[in-house]
Structure formats: C-alpha cells, structure tokens
Amino acid sequence: MSPCENDTPINWKRNLIVAWLGCFLTGAAFSLVMPFLPLYVEQLGVTGHSALNMWSGIVFSITFLFSAIASPFWGGLADRKGRKLMLLRSALGMGIVMVLMGLAQNIWQFLILRALLGLLGGFVPNANALIATQVPRNKSGWALGTLSTGGVSGALLGPMAGGLLADSYGLRPVFFITASVLILCFFVTLFCIREKFQPVSKKEMLHMREVVTSLKNPKLVLSLFVTTLIIQVATGSIAPILTLYVRELAGNVSNVAFISGMIASVPGVAALLLSAPRLGKLGDRIGPEKILITALIFSVLLLIPMSYVQTPLQLGILRFLLGAADGALLPAVQTLLVYNSSNQIAGRIFSYNQSFRDIGNVTGPLMGAAISANYGFRAVFLVTAGVVLFNAVYSWNSLRRRRIPQVSN
C-alpha cells in the first residue's frame, strides 16, 4: 500500500492531476525516440533506401499492432485487479523494454522489443478508465478532456527533446533517458494515485456476451469504437506525406524540415490550448454528442481546402484549426463511453477503444501512402475528408435516436 492510500475518501481531482502527469511522461517517453527511429534502424545494420524505408515502417507499426491485440486482455485484467495495478505494470514494463532497446544489437532484436513495447503498453487507456470511474458523471467531459492534454503535451515536447538529446549524446543514450522517464512515472503512480478497488475473481467476471448485454446501447458503443478508429485513420493518413507536401508547397528552401515540424505540431498546440478541456466542459453542459458531430463536420470543412492550398502558411493555419476540432473528438467519444457503460466494465471498454485506436494508427499511414503513390498528395486530403464525412453521418445516425440520460454526482 502506498503512503498516499488510507481510509480517507479518494480525491479524484488529485488523481486527475497525477494521472495527467503520468500521461504526459508516457507521451513524452514514446515520442522521444520517434525523430531518429530510421537513423537507429540504419545504425543496426539496415542499408539501402528501400530496405530502410521498409524496416522503419515495420518497426513503427508493429508497436500499435501488438497494442491492439493486447489491450482487451489488459482491460479485462484491470476490471479484475484494479486500474492502478495496470498503470504500474505498464510504466515499469515499458521502462524495462526501453533499456533493452538501447542495448539491441540487430534489427530483429529491435523489432521484437518494439512488439513487446506494444504488448506491455496501455497506460493511457487505463488512466482514462481510472478517472472515468472516479469523477462525477456530470464532469466526465471536462476531466477526460483535461486528461487527454497530458498525452498531447508529452507527444509535442518529446520529439524536440529527443532530437536535442540524440544530437548531444547519441542515439542509444536516449533510450536509457526514456526508460528513466518511465520509471519516474512508475513511482509517481505508485505513491500518489489512490484507488479503492475490490478484486473480482475470474468466475465473477462478466463474459463478453454479458459485457455487451450490460451496455445501455451496444450499437452506439460499437459506433464510438469505429469513430475512434476513423479519427486515427484521418490523422495518420496525412503523416507520411506531410513533409513531402510541405516541400512541394515551399519550393526550394533550406529549412523544409523545420517548416514541416512546425506544421506537424500546430494541431497538437491547438488541441492543448483551445479545445480539449474547454470543449469537454462545454460537452458536459450541452451534451458530448453535439460536440462530436460538430467537430466531425468542422474537420471535413477544413480537410477539403487543404487539398487546394498554395503555401505552407495556408496549410499551417488550416491544420491549427483542424487541431482545435480534433482535440474535442476523442474526449467526446470517451465521455459517451462513460455514459453508456458501468464502472464494472470500464477497463475493458476503454481497452477495446484503444484497440480500435491502434488499428487506426496502423491503417492510416498505409492508406495515405497508397493514395499519394497513385493519385498524388492532394488526393489524400480529399479521400480523408470523405472518410470523416462518412463517420459524421454514421455517428449522427447512431446518436439521433438516443437521448443522453440525466446524470448527477
């Protein structure tokens, strides 16, 4: 039992602050190594342009693939043993794997460790489940929106810090620094997260069919999972072509990498500063379903003109506005999941949602790369807009016959 745990009532606001810090640290830890991942693959002995591209894509995607496979298992274990235990397992497990990555001697070892990283992940969905089961229902949107800014902040700062550290100390030491960040996250969680959880035996656990029947609206929950997948597909489809598209727009400039980095970062800045907590709080007042549909439509209206921009500045402005819309989407989905499931199955519901998110992280870049190879960069934005429009119609159809029940503390 940690020093913070006693018989006093749980302070969910303090847990939210500590969970936010944990999501920030894990978000930073994951993104610290991303700027130089292809360079590390090359250092491990992969040579040749095509081979380097192939292996870089594989080692990047395999983490999300194995995370999608493992998330439901960890979600079920969280519902049996408690969410705090899963947070500790995730932080410590990923920390150990990061150390081993820094010691990898060939590409196959690194590939296996990237897969293991996906298997042992799950800090963010379990943090979402923990806060969702403790926060008053009428504050769910604000709390989950605030929590989402932790991971976004870490993911924004991580690449910059990782690039500086790699330039200063080399590639391998960054993995050890990342491991230290994750171990710090482990101890912060151990000593300052509080959870009163009564373990449930395996026999008492609800089976899959019982989980589905316990949902207030199973079809709606499935549509929310699909929405999460499409959000990530839309985000990931642009990632592979963004730098090349910026270079096409900018022409012959020497700082195309810097410009691309800025344009890649502005959606996260917008989500952090403008939308996630504020629109989450608004969703608590007017209903998260209204926020979800409005943000999806707004995203479509911003993606279409991205295909016709003529300068990097125009693209940057549109991506900033898109970030403001995107920052409201996942918190709205998560709030609707809270409204439509019980605390007893929260771990599994959030883990299933994470699985769909990971599948989107894998398929989005593949879709974007395939479209750009066959039809050009600008077509990626139009196809992505069509996918998001389909999701808006699908979500509206799923939501229009339901009415959010009145919730109270």
UniProtKB/Swiss-Prot annotation:
GO terms for cellular component: plasma membrane. PANTHER family: MULTIDRUG RESISTANCE PROTEIN MDTG (PTHR43414:SF6). This is Multidrug resistance protein MdtG. It is a multi-pass membrane protein. The chain crosses the membrane at residues 16-36, 58-78, 92-112, 115-135, 146-166, 173-193, 224-244, 256-276, 291-311, 379-399. The keyword Nucleotidyltransferase does not apply. It is found in: Cell inner membrane. The keyword Oxidoreductase does not apply. It comes from Escherichia coli O9:H4 (strain HS). CDD domains: MFS_MdtG_MDR_like. It comes from the Bacteria. Keywords: Antibiotic resistance, Cell inner membrane, Cell membrane, Membrane, Transmembrane, Transmembrane helix, Transport. One of its GO terms (molecular function) is transmembrane transporter activity. Belongs to the major facilitator superfamily. DHA1 family. MdtG (TC 2.A.1.2.20) subfamily. Confers resistance to fosfomycin and deoxycholate.
